[in-house]
């Protein structure tokens, strides 16, 4: 009889460990997906990650606190399991509503922050969105761990072992919840459908518990199936407010191809702010955007048979297209980390024979011996920026790959002024590497171009009207 009870007890504990794993998987999956669903609207800066991580830790802490209080009041194992089912059901319902309500909540939070003038609109809006969309399911998910501890520990002698195993499975689930959405789920089915996947996983575990305690099994099963089907049917995978020409989510970016107000196709990696590439008209040598001023940098190079230009942040090749239309004495190497973006060049944008390398810009520089006359860094904007391409060491790597009198040119987007914190920080860091640094405020798009070189470029920049006085 004792052997049978031990086997039965072991089976129950295994279920509890599995629940801890699923809990960790869903919590970290929500964190990863939450950042991805907000980044097209608010960017993917450290600030957004800070908000998401802080919110999740606070919500889990609140859930742990109240879950522990509740667990102490529940004497029987069955009542604890009933509470787990209820909390999982609430989390499931709220997680599955994220695809339905995210756009409304995001737009509402932006309007609220703008109207009330609460300060940093992006920061305040993202905080409001995070609280409204994710706090409730995360708090209820946070109650699961203390409830599991309550029913898993049957004697003080095994407390350490049981708690260690619960933590182990929870952490393992967290690792899976971090990796699987980023690498597999989001690129394949999109970030909105990923929330439905987490909901489906929770539905499975709560239905298993309902069957185990023999209470509301049929009702909970019907609720889960109907709610999932409704969310799947009513929600769309699109994150844009209008209807884009093309939309997808890659391992690195949200990708949107749509028409600008002037009718030109534009590639965007966000919903509200700017464009990363545009399609240049076949019979025109100008785009009507800041690129027209940027490509005049080619005139600053020393006369020679052929210039070699490196573009880090190639996108779909707008900069290169305009260079080819206006000059013929150069060759371009383009570095772009996102293969999906490069693939769109052939489908929607201008074709070229440029050498395109799928790589991180810094990794490429560290793995090549090629030298260039001009290195263009088109990767900087307020809401999304690769931090590894902002350091002194990176600019030193760039300089090490410049020919004599070569130029480093930074394009800093999204309405920065000459004295904005971002422009001052990047130009100051570049100044540590290049003795001559200059800034230019473009007439269109409000971008800032920062140049760095060993050579004094002031007269040449004035001749080309590419220098803005402070």
Predicted regions and their residues:
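Alpha-helical transmembrane segments of multi-pass membrane proteins
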Residues: 2-247, 259-262, 271-276, 299-308, ...
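ATP-binding glycine-rich phosphate-binding loop
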Residues: 248-252
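Short, surface-exposed beta-strand/loop micro-motifs that present aromatic residues
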Residues: 253-258
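Class I SAM-dependent methyltransferase Rossmann-like catalytic core
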Residues: 277-297
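Extracytoplasmic/secreted cell-surface and envelope-processing proteins
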Residues: 294, 384-386, 417-421, 460-461
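Flexible, glycine-/basic-rich loop-and-beta segments that form/coincide
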Residues: 455-470
